[in-house]
Design a protein with these regions (language model features):
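Extended, low-hydrophobicity, polar/charged segments
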Residues: 1-159
Length: 159
């Protein structure tokens, strides 16, 4: 059902995007990158957060990025709290490992971390733990109605 909801949203909106499915596991950044033959940071990791108000939000980051608690608190005026595992499917309509900003069960605010802008193409999940969507980064804001933010930790420079 989840992959089908993603496919339907693309078809209904005449979007030139396709859900790619595989037998391989794509539930984690590492396995998704290996399956799709791309670098880990090109996997657009979708993380769900639950605000104190009870509202669920999604934040997309590059695969290796980590949310910076201070930046999150500055943006959302509260501590970062992930959606509890037992609420993910109900909140998004997608299972853990397949959460993406497309074909959601209900409208959710979507935030796109600036780390994604390092790439021309990224690969968010496609609604299951064995799917992905190849998406040009310059399309993300429009198709997700997302807001660009800076909530990830700055990378540590190589020595």
């Amino acid at each position: 059902m989840s992959v089908e909801s993603v496919k339907k949203i693309f078809e209904d909106n005449n979007l030139p995007l396709k859900v790619e499915e595989t037998e391989g596991d794509t539930a984690t950044v590492k396995t998704a990158a290996a399956t799709w033959g791309v670098e880990e940071d090109q996997i657009a990791k979708t993380m769900g957060y639950k605000l104190k108000s009870g509202e669920y939000i999604l934040i997309l980051t590059k695969g290796g990025a980590r949310v910076d608690n201070k930046k999150f608190k500055d943006k959302f005026k509260e501590k970062a709290t992930m959606i509890p595992h037992d609420e993910v499917l109900e909140a998004t309509g997608h299972p853990i490992g397949g959460v993406c900003p497309f074909g959601l069960k209900r409208p959710l605010r979507v935030y796109l971390d600036k780390t994604l802008k390092e790439f021309e193409i990224v690969y968010p999940a496609g609604g299951s733990d064995h799917s992905a969507v190849k998406v040009p980064v310059d399309m993300l804001e429009g198709i997700t109605q997302g807001e660009w933010v800076d909530v990830c930790k700055n990378p540590v420079p190589a020595e």
